[in-house]
């Protein structure tokens, strides 16, 4: 069976700080992994596809990296109100 684990479950950083979110898979997923952010009342917004390609109109504060079974999302210059998937809660300290 295919397994996908997003970590950490929660991360905190100050406004303007940087956080890293990891996605570990049981098989190679690098060409198929995409990162989305939820939008209340709307479909999720695509941030990154093919593990590291920034979607059109998305800020360069978001960076995808890694390959194979471990893919990473790095978010820099944090702002309030950022959240990612059901797997990671991002708390921005004001």
Curated annotation (Swiss-Prot):
Keywords: Adaptive immunity, Immunity, Immunoglobulin. Residues 1-23 are annotated as: Framework-1. Residues 50-56 are annotated as: Complementarity-determining-2. GO terms for biological process: adaptive immune response. GO terms for cellular component: immunoglobulin complex. Residues 35-49 are annotated as: Framework-2. Residues 83 are annotated as: Complementarity-determining-3. Disulfide bonds: none annotated. It comes from the Eukaryota. Residues 84-93 are annotated as: Framework-4. This chain is an antibody to pneumococcus strain III vaccine. This is Ig kappa-B5 chain V region 2699. It comes from Oryctolagus cuniculus.
